[in-house]
Structures are given as C-alpha cells and as structure tokens.
C-alpha cells in the first residue's frame, strides 16, 4: 500500500514541494530567505486582515481609526506594529534573497528570476499603497509626490495621474482605492509565489558551487525543514525585539500628525526600503529622466541573465566579480542614506555618483569582470 502523502492528490503536491523534493546537499544559510519570505507574507496577510476589521478608508476617520486600533482594540497596538515592522522585515529578506540570487548566479534560471522580479514590483506596489492608509502627514505627501511622477509620461501622464487619484488631488477616492489594492495584492503575490516555486522545482535549486548536484541530492525533509525552522525562529526573535522594544524606530515622526494638504513637510521621503530608488530618481534633474531611471533601477535585474559572460555560474571562485558585488552592496547602502538626506550639496553629487556607479557595475563592470576571469583561467 502506498503512503498517503504519495497517493492523495492534494498531499502529493505538498509532498513533491516540501518533503521528498530532491535538494542539493550543500546549500547554505543564504537559501533560507525564500522560506522566510513565505513566513513574512503569511504574517503580513494575517495581521493585515485583523487591522482591516477595524480600519476605515475615509479621509475623515482613517487617522483616528488607526489610533482607535492602538488604544481600544485588544492587542491592537501589537498587531499594528507587527504589520508596520513586518513590511521592513519583508524587504530585508527580499533584498538578501535577490542579493543571493545575483551572487550565486541563480538568475540563470530565467523563468524563476523573471517571476521573482514581478514579485518584487508587486511587493513594492503593495507597500506603497499600504503606506498611505494611516493618513498621516508623510503618508499623504509621499502619495502625492510619488503618484505625481506619472505625470511625466508624455501625452497620457496628467490624465493617468487624475485617473489614479480619482479627482484632482489625493483625497477620499484615492484612499478608498488604495485600500482595495492593498487588500487584494498580497493574495496575487501569494499566487505568484506558487508559480515562482513551480518554475524553481522544474529545474531544481542552485547551490553555492554553481555546479550540477544531481548525483548527491538529499530529501528536503527532515534536513531543510529543520534548517528553515531554525531560520524562522531566529527571524521571529529579531522581529519581536524590533516590535516590542523599538516599534517606531523605522517610521517617520511626521506620521503622528494627521494629513494636512495645506502644510508641506520640509523634506518628503518614502519608507527606508525605497530610499535607494528614491535617491536614483532624485539624482537626475529632469522629471521624465528621473522616472525612467527609477523604473530601470529595478528592471535592470531582468537583463542579468543576458549579461552573464563568465564560464562559471557562481561568484564563489571569482575574486574580481566578488569585489564588484560588494561594491554594489556598499553603493546601495550609500544610496539608501542619500535618499533620506535633503536635496543640497554635498548630497546631490554623492547621489549622482552612486546612481551612475549602480548602473555601471551591473551593466558594464560585472560582464567585463566575467570576461577577464575567463581569460585569466584560459577558458
């Protein structure tokens, strides 16, 4: 008689994805972040669901409904801070996951990689529309500035912005539709994550050496379920420390003031996880040029499979490319810092140099380094 998990139609799917899945025996802790992203998504959907039960998407009551959640709802303060800081945690895991994909050459699984880029764009869209909902001062002005960027699109720009706003400014209609988008998008992300896994399991996982590991694969359970469980516990410890001891550390003080369209904050900026893209946007003095650079800062990732010149897949044995990779990481941290600074010297020139370096490393220096390393190894 066959074991139920191998014969039952539903159990069979779970079995092939999480139990009997053949996995490389040498994947490191950097491979934990895929499962951690799944955990973050579940956490965000659950906390978001409970917040939606008490939130009202109306400009007159949105701010006070969030206050009501924190003051009057049982553990409302905890749910709210878990949801707000859960977004930061989500993006930390997401950026590490993408960084690991670049370092170990996982982008050569083109279908999986492209679905991943789509997931990144959807997650950024979800975070942006969710950011507006509490209707604080920076939330309101952030929404106004970022949506207004679409007016740079020739011919249809202004109409497109007014269509998104539902009027001539960010108002009740905007808040209502942003709430609707924020509610539905995580479920689309969850469905796409399934497709992401489906494509990954077609090819099997990559490994730190970047070489085929078909001859020595091990079952996913119990080896990697245990490893993922350990990663989840460590992540939750970090998360709860942030939520319970420093809940407002990553937020903006301006958001404790209700939105006021007559009073502009001195320095408008998005959440920390968008600052690198915001710095690239600001580094170009032209509005349309800035919007194009902003879009390319994410879409450039889609070119990586076609810019791979090395005969080796991973960066594990390529010191020149490793140096460039860590330069890219340092550059992104620099851009994140610059995005939070006012638009004045010396921050302007630092942002412009860092933005140019970001594209230069990805589009030119890393492919060149791959060719040089091939030459050095006489390949």
Curated annotation (Swiss-Prot):
GO terms for cellular component: mitochondrial inner membrane; respiratory chain complex III. GO terms for biological process: mitochondrial electron transport, ubiquinol to cytochrome c. InterPro entries: Cyt_b/b6_C, Cyt_b/b6_C_sf, Cyt_b/b6_N, Cytb/b6-like_sf, Cytochrome_b, Cytochrome_b_C_euk/bac, Cytochrome_b_N_euk/bac, Di-haem_cyt_TM. The keyword Electron transport applies. Keywords: Electron transport, Heme, Iron, Membrane, Metal-binding, Mitochondrion, Mitochondrion inner membrane, Respiratory chain, Transmembrane, Transmembrane helix, Transport, Ubiquinone. It is found in: Mitochondrion inner membrane. Heme b b562 binds at residues 83, 182. The chain crosses the membrane at residues 33-53, 77-98, 113-133, 178-198, 226-246, 288-308, 320-340, 347-367. Heme b b566 binds at residues 97, 196. GO terms for molecular function: metal ion binding; ubiquinol-cytochrome-c reductase activity. It holds the Pfam family Cytochrom_B_C. It is a multi-pass membrane protein. Binds 2 heme b groups non-covalently. Its cofactor is heme b. Belongs to the cytochrome b family. Heme 1 (or BL or b562) is low-potential and absorbs at about 562 nm, and heme 2 (or BH or b566) is high-potential and absorbs at about 566 nm. Component of the ubiquinol-cytochrome c reductase complex (complex III or cytochrome b-c1 complex) that is part of the mitochondrial respiratory chain. The b-c1 complex mediates electron transfer from ubiquinol to cytochrome c. Contributes to the generation of a proton gradient across the mitochondrial membrane that is then used for ATP synthesis. The cytochrome bc1 complex contains 11 subunits: 3 respiratory subunits (MT-CYB, CYC1 and UQCRFS1), 2 core proteins (UQCRC1 and UQCRC2) and 6 low-molecular weight proteins (UQCRH/QCR6, UQCRB/QCR7, UQCRQ/QCR8, UQCR10/QCR9, UQCR11/QCR10 and a cleavage product of UQCRFS1). This cytochrome bc1 complex then forms a dimer. This is Cytochrome b. The gene is MT-CYB.
